[in-house]
């Protein structure tokens, strides 16, 4: 297979100060996926592992905000078509870092708790779900360049849940071991199998794609209308002893969203403790607690589950 056919250095990026490809083996690829991370810090990390090796968990590039200039400054660690090291890759599982993916870490946070702490401390930073326009513009320019020079599609997952519900597969957003190898486009760390991290959180992905397409003067894509959310049938259908099609419908959607582990068999029409536990897990993933996570679906649980 032909590899490394496009330009290997992002224009304007510093590929000297934090260059790690000379220190680690890297697989030659032909990228068709871009994966976005957040560093959860305010400086460029050294990406040190437990053995003290700098760059051992580095992506291909890191973007740090320059608040004075209102721009992102880019540091490159590996060539574009070289495998980086920022994704977990379990023994015997699917390929992650080496599966034609270029990775970019965005300095800042996607965690609302960290954001609140830094605001209180007066630390200048980017909370990526609410990134300033200039940061979104520069990130979109990077995606546009990847599309134009490497053919990375300007498309990706529809679900970018907020952290911490995005951690592990709390919001059912993570790709499976079978869907990931076929994926092409832009995704987040939260979407890659064998990984637990929930970054980059609820970034405005549609806006990023729109900005990238505008930078290339591409027409707006025509999207099929979203499927209508089925009407909530009422709480009475989800109680001990109830048996109806709505319970089956609920259970199938829970499995689709990643909560199948709560079912030893099924799901089926009879309301069981398995259904309640699966619903409760989904509710907790919305950061609800107490009565809001009791395992019995109400209108808002239903709406979010089927969104």
Task: Annotate each language-model stretch with its function.
Residues 2-154, 176:
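Active-site-adjacent loop/helix surface patches within enzyme catalytic domains
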Residues 217-269, 273-274:
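Acidic, Ser/Thr/Pro/Gly-enriched interdomain connector segments
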Residues 90-91, 121-134, 234-242, 264-269, ...:
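Second-shell loop/turn segments in exported
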Residues 100, 105-110, 188, 192, ...:
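Glycine-rich, acidic and aromatic/proline-enriched surface loops and short helix-turn segments
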Residues 138, 246, 278:
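Charged catalytic carboxylate motif
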Residues 2-11, 109-228, 281-284, 297-307:
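Basic/polar, cationic surfaces and motifs that engage anionic cell-wall
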Residues 273-288:
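SH3/SH3-like beta-barrel superfamily modules
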């Amino acid at each position: 297979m032909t590899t490394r056919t496009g330009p290997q250095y992002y224009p304007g990026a510093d590929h000297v100060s934090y260059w790690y490809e000379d220190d680690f083996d890297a697989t030659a690829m032909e990228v068709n996926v871009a994966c976005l991370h957040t560093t959860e810090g305010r400086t460029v990390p050294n990406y040190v592992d437990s053995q003290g090796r700098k760059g051992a968990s580095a992506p291909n590039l890191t973007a740090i905000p320059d608040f004075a200039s209102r721009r992102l400054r880019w540091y490159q660690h590996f060539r574009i078509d070289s495998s980086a090291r920022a994704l977990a890759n379990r023994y015997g599982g699917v390929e992650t870092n080496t599966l034609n993916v270029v990775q970019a870490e965005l300095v800042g946070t996607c965690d609302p708790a960290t954001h609140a702490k830094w605001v209180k401390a007066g630390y200048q930073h980017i909370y990526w779900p609410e990134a300033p326009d200039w940061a979104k513009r520069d990130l979109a320019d990077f995606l546009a360049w990847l599309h134009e020079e490497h053919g990375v599609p300007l498309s990706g997952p529809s679900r970018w849940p907020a952290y911490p519900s995005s951690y592990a597969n709390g919001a059912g957003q993570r790709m499976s071991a079978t869907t990931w190898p076929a994926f092409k486009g832009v995704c987040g760390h939260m979407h890659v199998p064998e990984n637990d991290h929930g970054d980059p959180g609820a970034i405005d992905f549609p806006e990023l794609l729109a900005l990238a397409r505008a930078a290339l003067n591409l027409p707006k894509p025509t999207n099929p209308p979203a499927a209508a959310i089925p009407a909530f049938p009422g709480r009475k259908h989800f109680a001990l002893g109830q048996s109806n099609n709505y319970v089956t419908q609920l259970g199938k959607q829970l499995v689709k969203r990643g909560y199948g582990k709560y079912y030893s068999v099924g799901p089926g029409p009879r309301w069981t403790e398995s259904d309640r536990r699966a619903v409760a897990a989904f509710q907790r993933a919305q950061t609800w607690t107490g009565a809001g996570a009791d395992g019995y679906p109400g209108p808002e649980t239903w709406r979010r589950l089927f969104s």
